[in-house]
């Protein structure tokens, strides 16, 4: 019996002289690995459909083992992302984040749509940092360690000023001071709350000042390191690229 799925390539591993083991995050099955024979060869029928963050339709035998890809059809390769090295670095981080956060063959349509929406938004030119923090929040929710963004962790108060505490796992009000907290503007606190509740499309035109951008990166980097348990190579590459970009400016 053959299975037909819509999937996004989240990881590839070379196998032998010409083959690839391709890991797809699919709408129907969750994460699944398949063998794409000959995919390393530029002229092969599976070469295009086995590239990172390609979205396509894939057909392979139903099997608990490593199934062999029989047919594939590329829906989109997100060409605008591929034209820009920095955007590619963001996309690769999201792929590894999803890959490392989900188990094999556990369906998660909401997360598939989030990854799909993120790639579409990046391809359309949306702010990569806004998308990244949206994806990170959703992954933290999936892992069961999302920060409390509805009010003060201690008392539920929503009165400004609001602080963010990595140690306490979310917002803190001025009545519950703590060392190492990050002071948030009213706008940033509201943005974080809204990002935890709404679709990505709602934030398509959100402007970020340089100061806010640095603050959010600091906040999410510290929180992800403390709570996600993930140490990702693609995140280190992205951070190096961001630092290089800042030095050039």
Swiss-Prot record:
Q: Tell me, what's a Pfam family for it?
A: RecO_N
Gene3D superfamilies recorded for this chain? Nucleic acid-binding proteins, Recombination protein O, C-terminal domain
Q: Which UniProt keywords apply?
A: DNA damage, DNA recombination, DNA repair
**Alphabetical GO biological process terms:** DNA recombination; double-strand break repair
Gene Ontology, cellular component aspect = bacterial nucleoid
The record's annotation in SUPFAM superfamilies points to: ArfGap/RecO-like zinc finger, Nucleic acid-binding proteins
Instruction: Provide the function of this protein.
Output: Involved in DNA repair and RecF pathway recombination.
NCBIfam families, sorted: reco
* Protein family (similarity comment): Belongs to the RecO family.
Protein's UniProt name = DNA repair protein RecO
Q: Which gene encodes it?
A: recO
């Amino acid at each position: 019996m053959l299975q037909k799925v819509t999937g996004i390539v989240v990881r590839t591993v070379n196998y032998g002289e010409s083959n690839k083991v391709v890991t797809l995050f699919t709408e129907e099955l969750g994460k699944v690995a398949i063998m794409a024979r000959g995919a390393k060869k530029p002229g092969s029928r599976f070469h295009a459909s086995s590239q990172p963050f390609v979205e396509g339709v894939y057909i392979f035998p139903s099997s608990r083992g490593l199934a062999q890809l029989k047919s594939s059809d590329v829906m989109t390769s997100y060409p605008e992302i591929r034209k820009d090295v920095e955007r590619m670095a963001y996309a690769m981080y999201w792929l590894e984040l999803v890959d490392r956060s989900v188990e094999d063959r556990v369906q998660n349509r909401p997360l598939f749509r989030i990854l799909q929406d993120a790639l579409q938004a990046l391809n359309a030119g949306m702010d990569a940092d806004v998308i990244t923090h949206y994806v990170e929040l959703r992954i933290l929710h999936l892992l069961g360690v999302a920060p409390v963004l509805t009010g003060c962790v201690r008392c539920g108060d929503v009165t400004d000023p609001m602080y963010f505490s990595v140690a306490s796992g979310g917002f803190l009000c001025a009545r519950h001071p703590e060392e190492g907290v990050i002071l948030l503007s009213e706008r940033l606190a509201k943005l974080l709350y809204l990002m935890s509740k709404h679709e990505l499309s709602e934030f398509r035109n959100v402007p970020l000042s340089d100061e806010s951008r640095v603050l959010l990166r600091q906040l999410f980097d510290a929180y992800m390191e403390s709570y996600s348990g993930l140490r990702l190579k693609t995140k280190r590459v992205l951070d190096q690229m961001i630092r290089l970009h800042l030095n050039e400016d």
